Amino acid sequence: PYFKVIENCYHHLDMLFTGLSTFQSFQANQFLKENYGPELFKDIPDCDVAGMIMGRPYNIKGEFFPDFEQHICGISMNDIMKTPIRFCVVRNRFKSEALLGALRSGIITHLVTNDAIAQRVLQNID
């Protein structure tokens, strides 16, 4: 019952606040790597993952991996995209590729980052 109450709240959000993750940070977490990695990423080549946002991996083109959604426990992609403000903060220069993919996906509506990261993203657009 508790999760149903929360799930109903997801349908009426005004804002989401998030950060980005890299696949390397997922792999650095021994527990996640050993217990979830083999199943979640079995059909996804490591080099194809540009980043992760709200638990979902995507490629540099901003495409989310479709088979991944069934493993998500929490807010659905549909509810994420219906939320009008999706605010993201990126402050690590090593996340420029993750940021570029996320921006291409359309999942971010508002962004806070610094000039150096923005410049790195612009350099990688082509």
Task: For the regions a language model picked out, list residue spans one by one.
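Conserved phosphate- and dinucleotide-binding cores of soluble alpha/beta proteins
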Residues: P1-I125
